[in-house]
Design a protein with these regions (language model features):
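Extreme N-terminal basic, low-complexity initiation segments
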Residues: 2-8
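Anionic-ligand binding patches
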Residues: 12-16, 20-25, 31-57, 61-249
């Protein structure tokens, strides 16, 4: 009886089964983002027996660069961070860039949201509220772009013009007159998403993880997880304990 030659998918699944846990690096040390992204990744289904797991820079012994966000868009800034961290760690990395866009301000502060004012998140919230004093149109949206990059820049996504993957998400709502709630971070205490009577600062992680700009962008990321796993399986180094990196953890 002639044996059937294993298909590429069968061979891939066998290799993934040996790996069990596959790691991808979050290109941020922000503890709020680590928590938020960890929640996103925990909801991903396994591919065969392999699971894509998020790790943070604090889990590795690498020295990571300070990345200046000099891009002209969320995507460019996210790519700068993802590519730099991927090269430093020798493993795939995911990064995001985000901002709040206020209709009455022509989309500002946008990509400058994190640098719109010196000081803390609270200082930036107060800066924006001052800018909006006396303005009745409170329409705004949170925007985010997520990027996955690889250390060698190899294109695995079928897009000849680029060597990374990106996905965008937007969450529309209105600006509150004053901060409400102590949950979340950034501009969360003054952003009320459409369909809700509370700010992100009041709603908490359970709701935010379903409707936020990053959550919407991550749905696009989730669609290409099989491609990410396939790439890692093909390039997997058996001495790396399941990840594609040169750092230890």
């Amino acid at each position: 009886m002639t044996k059937t030659k294993p298909t590429c998918l069968t061979r891939l699944r066998k290799r993934l089964a040996k790996m069990r846990e596959i790691k991808i690096l979050l290109a941020s040390g922000n503890l709020h983002k680590v928590r938020e992204f960890s929640g996103f990744f925990s909801e991903l289904p396994p591919f065969g027996d392999a699971k894509l797991t998020l790790i943070s820079p604090g889990d590795l012994s690498c020295a990571f660069p300070e990345v200046e966000e000099t891009g002209a868009s969320y995507e460019e800034n996210a790519l700068l961070k993802a590519a730099a961290f991927a090269r430093a760690a020798g493993m795939p990395a995911i990064a995001d860039d985000s901002g709040i866009e206020v209709r009455a301000l022509g989309g500002e502060p946008g990509i400058r949201s994190a640098r719109a004012s010196e000081g803390s998140d609270s200082d930036r919230v107060n800066w924006l509220l001052d800018k909006m004093k006396g303005i009745r149109d409170r329409g705004a949206c949170f925007a985010a772009c997520l990027v996955i990059a690889f250390p060698n820049g190899k294109n695995i996504f079928g897009a000849a013009e680029r060597d990374y993957f990106s996905a965008e998400g937007r969450c529309f709502g209105t600006l509150a007159e004053s901060p409400r709630g102590t949950l979340g971070f950034g501009y969360d205490p003054i952003f009320t998403p459409d369909g809700y009577g509370a700010t992100f600062g009041e709603l908490g992680d359970e709701i935010k993880s379903r409707i936020s700009h990053r959550a919407i962008a991550f749905k696009g990321v989730a669609q290409i997880v099989p491609s990410v796993l396939k790439y890692i399986a093909v390039h997997h180094n058996e001495n790396c304990n399941g990840d594609l990196g040169r750092c230890t953890n």
